[in-house]
Amino acid sequence: MGLEHLEEFSYPKEHGEEVEYDSEQGVRKIYVKSIKETFNFDNVSEEEKQEGGDYYLGKKEDELDEVVLRPNPHRFVLFPIKYHEIWQFYKKAEASFWTAEEIDLSKDLVDWDNKLNADERYFISTVLAYFAASDGIVNENLLERFSSEVQIPEARCVYGFQIMIENIHSETYSLLLDTYIREPKEKQRHFDAILTMGSIKAKAKWALRWINDEDSTYAIRLVAFAAVEGIFFSGSFASIFWLKKRGLMPGLTFSNELICRDEGLHTDFACLMFSHLKHRPGRKVVEAIIVEAVDIEKEYFTDALPVSLLGMNKDLMCQYIEFVADRLLVALGNDKYYNVTNPFDFMENISLAGKTNFFEKKVSDYQIAGVMSGTKRAEKDDHTFTIDEDF
């Protein structure tokens, strides 16, 4: 995309926007709220909007009181390690390194052409179209905002490694689309999904508005991007695990396991960083962000799943998204909002957050030998965001 398209993502701060959906499925509009509309707490008492209240939005001056954010003259030197939990996340990520060249797609085209029907191909290609753009959006936030805002070197190491692995995810998804979709115009339409597919454009708009917002605190934007990686990705991961359950598309499903593990680690890390903040937004503020992300994700699956498939439909997927959202809310210190069960039996033993058994399993030998040996094994803490067990 050339520079002439940049105005597509100049998000209005005061007013939301209707995103048109233009496809053979028909035309409809998805409304993406402005940040002001998200936090429309006009009927709430002033007391509840103060720090400690459920509707506290935070203040920019709070950040000068945050150890992880205030100017740190020692940020250029890594040792001695002061934040061992954060450093452990970096070492886990480092030990999990992989490349797109390790994914074998040689058997996938046979399944794509002969074992998936047209509705299933539409569903999976829509999922991949979102994924192909989403990692670039996550990286823009890391490059433009989080990496420069956070002042402790341990966290900067995590963000730096995340930028690299998100590039590998983006390369992998682009490679998958390039392999499966062979008609040139259709292929380009999927690569341009944040401009051509309304529900994907809405997800992109929602994420990009937080990057562009100069008023929201780091804490609020941390919750928003935990939602991007923990909610906007979760249903799409589940859709590919659904193929794995059926024994289809081994290259796609293997890459999905690796990427799901990585993104789970990123979501866990967001929750850990949130726990390190002294001035956190109120519970209702966190809830408003998560619930809004869920609503947009449900709109997305209305488009991605226009018909019911075997063991997969829009209603089940929407319930699964609510289930995962509750787990994220709890990991951020909130109560559950939806109180629903996991509708997918094939996701019972999968964590979206790098749960220890999933991390150690590594699908094969994807933990680089020796990387973890120099660090103390972190004990399981209260910030692990799982999608299978009840609290």
Curated annotation (Swiss-Prot):
The active site is at Y173. It is found in: Nucleus; Cytoplasm. Transmembrane segments: none annotated. GO terms for molecular function: metal ion binding; ribonucleoside-diphosphate reductase activity, thioredoxin disulfide as acceptor. Its main location: nucleus. InterPro entries: Ferritin-like_SF, RNR-like, RNR_small, RNR_small_AS, RNR_small_fam. CDD domains: RNRR2. Binds 2 iron ions per subunit. One of its GO terms (biological process) is pyrimidine deoxyribonucleoside triphosphate biosynthetic process. GO terms for cellular component: cytoplasm; cytosol; nucleus; ribonucleoside-diphosphate reductase complex. Fe cation 2 binds at E166, E229, E263, H266. Its cofactor is Fe cation. It catalyses: a 2'-deoxyribonucleoside 5'-diphosphate + [thioredoxin]-disulfide + H2O = a ribonucleoside 5'-diphosphate + [thioredoxin]-dithiol. Disulfide bonds: none annotated. SUPFAM superfamilies: Ferritin-like (SSF47240). Its EC number is 1.17.4.1. Keywords: Cytoplasm, Deoxyribonucleotide synthesis, Iron, Metal-binding, Nucleus, Oxidoreductase. Fe cation 1 binds at D135, E166, H169. Heterodimer of a large and a small subunit. Provides the precursors necessary for DNA synthesis. Catalyzes the biosynthesis of deoxyribonucleotides from the corresponding ribonucleotides. Belongs to the ribonucleoside diphosphate reductase small chain family. This is Ribonucleoside-diphosphate reductase small chain. It comes from Schizosaccharomyces pombe (strain 972 / ATCC 24843).
